[in-house]
Amino acid sequence: MNNLKKIEVRIPLGRLTVITGISGCGKSSLMRGTLAELFKRNPDKTWASASGIKSIRHCYEVDQSPIGKTSRSCPATYVKIFDEIRKLFAQLPEARMKGFDASRFSFNNASGQCPECKGNGRIKLEMDFLPSTWTHCESCNGKRYNPATLAIRYNGQSIGDVLAMTIDEAAEFFAAHGKLHRTLSLLKETGLGYLQIGQPSPTLSGGEAQRIKLVTELTRGRISKTSIKSRKTQANLYLIEEPSIGLHLEDVKRLIDVLHRLVEEGHTVVVVEHHTGIMAEADNIIDMGPEAGESGGRIVSQGPPEKVANSKTSRTAPFLRAALKG
């Protein structure tokens, strides 16, 4: 594939593997062009043989594409907590008295949404010869819902107020609700506490979308390592490219914690990464090179970070050594 040169790659199951190397050396070709293709129905086969694939249940490419295809999608809908929030509002005495069920609190439902903005909280303005733009809906004041729906309040807050909360605020507000609090706390721990839970997905950065996807995987449920080893169940393979882009040091530390949690749950994680802090946390490193283009596509060194750091030919080794020394 591209510039890969008949290499043999070993990726330990249930561990964190980081693929390193200079730009253009074959990192993406290895991950997207080979590893991801192994699990496709009609793969573009670029390998001679592969083993161990049956130990993997699903392969997920956790990229930086948007978390939703419409302006209505948001963190709360993507991580599935909005369903729980709607049920909570529907159980309130006033809601039951008025015959409101959980669907009433969906901003996609005509009976509950603001008739002016159709549940968006914003109005799309079509501009001649200019890109379309969005403006605040004055009818609902950006709350998305009609007055009757907004009149139902949980601890003094309407469903519109809840969607306007930041993840930090919502985690505290729903502290008594285990499932909601756990998911919101995970989002908070990955450095996303400043986002509104109802923030439209098109306004999120690629890095924010990627971390939301990682948290979603963490909420799917824990897999017993004993079950995996005894072949009673299979774990997933997660392929993640450059997740540290645009992150501050503290957020990188939070990202590392998320990657370790996936591994602790029995999954296999493969990351293409340039950040030495993440390299140093790997169980296994595959260092590609030695150069880019036709002079790349080979494995320069493979193994634990300490082994790769001592390589005489690796362009990554000096930087990794410095990171390991702290």
Where are these regions (language model features)?
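Conserved phosphate-binding elements of NTP-dependent enzyme cores
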Residues: 1-326
